[in-house]
Amino acid sequence: MSSKSNPPSAVHAKSQLSSRLRYNPDSAQLMLRLSTLEMPVFLDSSHDQSNCGRFDILSANPIAHIKIESGRLRVSDPEIEISGIDFFNGIRLLKQKYLPEPDPQIEWETELPFQGGILGYLGYPSLHGKNAIEIRDAFVGVYLWAVIVDHLKQSSHLVFHPQCPTAEKTRMQNWLSADEDFQAALAPANFSLRSPFTKELSRADYNQAFKQIAEFIAAGDCYQVNLTQQFRADCSGSPLAAYLLLRESTRAPFSAYINWGNGALLSLSPERFLKLTGTAVLTQPIKGTRPRGDSIEADERLAAELCASEKDRAENLMIVDLLRNDLGRVCKTGSIKATALFDLQSFSNVHHMVSSVSGELADDRDALDLLSSCFPGGSVTGAPKLRAMTIIEQLEAKARRAYCGTVFYLSANGNMDSNITIRTLLWQQDQLFCWAGGGIVSDSDCDAEYEECFHKISNIISVLQEQEREQEQEQEKE
C-alpha cells in the first residue's frame, strides 16, 4: 500500500488539482479501462442529464480500504482499529489519517462533485442492542484521484486530492490522456448465468410473514414494515460485463459498480438517500410504485393511478416524517422542510412516487454525522425505524447484505451524495444475489405486495436470463 505523502506546503491552484480529458458521452469505455486497476468504483448517472444524474465519478487504486463480508472484517492498515459496531468511527479514522484537513485556501473545482476522498458502500445493518447497529457488509476506500464526467457540459476532468503523490498524478494523466482506441482492446469479458434465478422465500412463507406484520400493525406496534425477499442464481464470467448489460436496459441516475476483488456490487438504483452540499442537506425517499404500461394509454393510466393513490401518499408521508425526525438530530432547528411531496418519476420498468426533504446541517456536524444519523434509510425499513428493523430481523429468512444499504462518496471538500441500494445485485463466488421488497401498511393487500416485488426486479432478472437464452441459441447454431 502506498504511504501517505506530506501535506501540501503551498496553496494548490485549480490547474494542479485537475486536468481536462476527452469527453465521451458513454462512460462504459472508461469503466472497462479502469476495471484493469485495483478496486474500481464507478458512480454512474447512466447519462441522465437531470439535476440528480449529471455526473459520473470513476476511480480505482485506493490508497487504503476497509471491507466487511458477512461480518468478516479486513483493514488494509493494521493501525486503524475498527469494528462493525463502530464502523462510522472507522471511516472517520481512515479519513483523518489519509485525508488530513486541506489548506483552507485551496481553490477547489467548485462545480465538480468529488475532489478525491472516500468512495464505497455500506450494506444493510443488523441491530446491536436496543439502539445501535452493526455493519456486516461494506467496502470503503480512500481514492486520491477520480475521473469526473459532466454530461450536462459535455466535459471530462481528471481530479486529484492534494495528497495524491506527484508520480501517481503524472502516471494517471499520461495513461488517461492517451489517444489510443481502447474499444476493441478492452471488450468486456463474457458473462452468463448457469442457473435461473430462484426465490429464497416460498409463497407460503411470504404469506405468513405478511400476516405477522399485519398483526403487529393492528396491535399498534408499528405503522409500516418493509418486507423483502432474496433471489439467487449461479453465474460465470465478469460482473462488470453483467453490469454493462443491465445498464443498457435499466437506466437509473444513482447506478453504481464497485469491485473489491473477491466481490462486486451492481446497483441500478433510482433513489437518492442523502446529499450534502456545503451545509445544505437533501433526501429524496421513494415510496409508491406502479409498473410501466404496455401502451401509451396504459402507461398514462398507471402513472395517474399512482399519483391519485391515497394509500401510496400515506406510505410516502410516513417515510417523509421519519426522515424529518432523523435529520432533526443533526440539522439546525427549524431548517427542515418538505420541499416536494408525491412527485412522479418514471423509469424503464416502473413509475415511482418521490418526495424531497431539505435541511441545514448544524455547525458542529459533518457528513459522517449526517450519514450515521439517518442510516439505514427509512424508505427501506418502515416506521418507527427501530421497531420495524426488529421485525425485519425476526421475519426475513436471509440477510439483506448489500441490499437496502447505500453507495456513497464523501469528497475532501466536505460534500457527499449517496443512494439507496435498491435494484442492486451482489456478485460473489460465481453467484449473483438480488432482492426486492415493499412497504406493508394497514390496508396492504398480500397478493399486490407480492406482485410488486416482481415488478421491481423483473427487468433485471429478464435481461440476464434473456442473455443466457441468446448464448445458448448461438451455441446450438455452432
Task: List the model feature ranges, each with a label.
Residues M1-E478:
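Extended alpha-helical targeting/anchoring segments
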